[in-house]
Every structure is written in structure tokens, then in C-alpha cells.
Amino acid sequence: MQQKTISIEQREKAGKGVSRKLRAVGRVPGVVYGKGIEPVAVSVDAKELAAAIVGEGGRNNLISLQGGGSLNGNTVIVADLQKAPLKGTFISVDFHKINMDEKVRVHVPVALIGTALGAKEGGMLELVMHSLDLECLPSQIPEHVEVDVTNLAIGHAIHVGELVLAAGVKALDDPKATIVSVHGKTKEEVTVEEG
């Protein structure tokens, strides 16, 4: 996964008034925290933040910090991002400082591959889990988890425990949880009902 860079500034003051003033000039208030450091209040340019989380990796992109005194050069991921519901503008961001040698927990989107056999036969494909919780080293964070549905027939499902993930990547969700399924009646059931 490609590492992005973002410029930050430490901020001395916190609170609603300060945060509003920052947002008015195109900056997003935030905090950097992680193992071995005290939380540090920061601000980041809204456009830089948007550019850092765009693309397949999204919020799981590795981000290198520039500026911010002692935070310069540290690698972070976006732990929490709040947006205004109507405007979609950033309200605040939390960065989690990571160590490249320690596993992290991330939320990764599911990408369906192929056309389900059951869907071709008139069934309805239902994506139950749009994302999965994974644990892996930062360098192993996938942009998405591919789930091949090509052979998925009506009345069948794919569960978390059936996924084949890369070495070192572990799914944290319940292994019995359904990711995707195909619902509907098979041709045999339809024929019996008509007869």
C-alpha cells in the first residue's frame, strides 16, 4: 500500500471555539495518539486530509506526518474521522501513531468478484458485510478483501471463516458471520410449485 504524506501543525488551544475558527480557514482539528506518546492536539489542511484518504485504501492508508515538532516523520493511520452530515466537511480527525513492526486492527471493505451462479439462475445476491475487521502488520493492510462469488448457488453463503487471507492477516469477525449469500427459489422448487 502506498504511503501518503500530510503536513500537520501542533495546536496549543482546544475547544469548540478554537475548532470552529480552524474549520473556517480550511483546517481540521485533530489529535495524534498511540503507544508511547501522550495525545497531541494538531490541525491539518482539509484538502490534504481528503487527498490522503482518497482511493482504495481510504482511511487505512499509511500517512507520514510532516511538521508538528516531535511528531515529524511518524507514521499514522486515521483512527476516527467525523464529517458534517449535510455538508460532508470534516469536523475532526484522530490519527493513531503506529509502529511498522506491530500489528494493527483495521476496518477493510469487501469487494465481490465475479457474478454469482445463483444470481444467473434468478436468485438475489445479498452483501451482508460491507467490511471486515482485520489484524495485520501495517505493511500488509489490504486495500480490500476480495470475495469470489462465481460458484455461489441459491441458498448458499460465504462466511468469514471460509476466506483465504494473505499470510499474517487475520480476520477478527466471527468466523460464522455471513459475508454474502444468494436467496431465492431454485428452478426445481419453481417447477414443483407450478405442477
Curated annotation (Swiss-Prot):
Keyword Repressor applies: no
Transmembrane segments: none
SUPFAM superfamilies, per the entry: Ribosomal protein L25-like
GO terms, molecular function: 5S rRNA binding; structural constituent of ribosome
Xref: Pfam families: Ribosomal_L25p (PF01386), Ribosomal_TL5_C (PF14693)
Stored InterPro entries: Rbsml_bL25/Gln-tRNA_synth_N, Ribosomal_bL25/Gln-tRNA_synth, Ribosomal_bL25_b-dom, Ribosomal_bL25_C, Ribosomal_bL25_long, Ribosomal_L25_dom, Ribosomal_uL5_bac-type
Record text on subunit structure and interactions: Part of the 50S ribosomal subunit; part of the 5S rRNA/L5/L18/L25 subcomplex. Contacts the 5S rRNA. Binds to the 5S rRNA independently of L5 and L18.
UniProt family annotation: Belongs to the bacterial ribosomal protein bL25 family. CTC subfamily.
HAMAP family: Ribosomal_bL25_CTC (MF_01334)
Name used for this protein in its record: Large ribosomal subunit protein bL25
Source organism per UniProt: Geobacter metallireducens (strain ATCC 53774 / DSM 7210 / GS-15)
UniProt gene name: rplY
